[in-house]
């Protein structure tokens, strides 16, 4: 019988990251060690109030990026200034867990982030205080699944990484060990030199 497939980052977490986190923060129980719970991708399509087809094309692009069919989000309230009615489609979102989450994370860190123009690392202040990290991308074409010739408009998206960490410091260390490119603090840079 063939061995079950394990994503690269899941194997890295089990082999290295969990032990490093336990050594640094001194967890007594293995279930206390923080892990990534889910990754949520959200794409708001502002021009969807005029043309409903824009949401379906955005959803198709997100499906290529995530490898999972997104849910179309609808407006909760009517807003006259935006010509928006309650129930109109205004975007799409997808929640990734388990293997798909680790595979997306691997593609994000190793392929997509290096393709961002003028990229100097992620903002270390984007944690929410409960160990979750939110980041925004300005263009979806950094993902290799999206062909530049076939897109109709460059769109951005929000990526929220939800962890089981209790504090931002634990979550920052967890994501750093996964390979998230946070710029080093000035004090850490002096120690490394």
From Swiss-Prot:
Lineage top rank: taxon: Bacteria
Key words, A-Z: Ribonucleoprotein, Ribosomal protein, RNA-binding, rRNA-binding, tRNA-binding
An annotated Gene Ontology molecular function: tRNA binding
Gene3D superfamilies named in the record: 3.30.1440.10
GO annotation (BP), single: translation
UniProt KW Ubl conjugation keyword: no
Any one GO CC term of the record: ribosome
Signal peptide: none
InterPro entries xref list: Ribosomal_uL5, Ribosomal_uL5_bac-type, Ribosomal_uL5_C, Ribosomal_uL5_CS, Ribosomal_uL5_dom_sf, Ribosomal_uL5_N
Protein function: This is one of the proteins that bind and probably mediate the attachment of the 5S RNA into the large ribosomal subunit, where it forms part of the central protuberance. In the 70S ribosome it contacts protein S13 of the 30S subunit (bridge B1b), connecting the 2 subunits; this bridge is implicated in subunit movement. Contacts the P site tRNA; the 5S rRNA and some of its associated proteins might help stabilize positioning of ribosome-bound tRNAs.
Similarity-based family: Belongs to the universal ribosomal protein uL5 family.
Subunit structure as annotated in this protein's UniProt entry: Part of the 50S ribosomal subunit; part of the 5S rRNA/L5/L18/L25 subcomplex. Contacts the 5S rRNA and the P site tRNA. Forms a bridge to the 30S subunit in the 70S ribosome.
Name of the protein: Large ribosomal subunit protein uL5
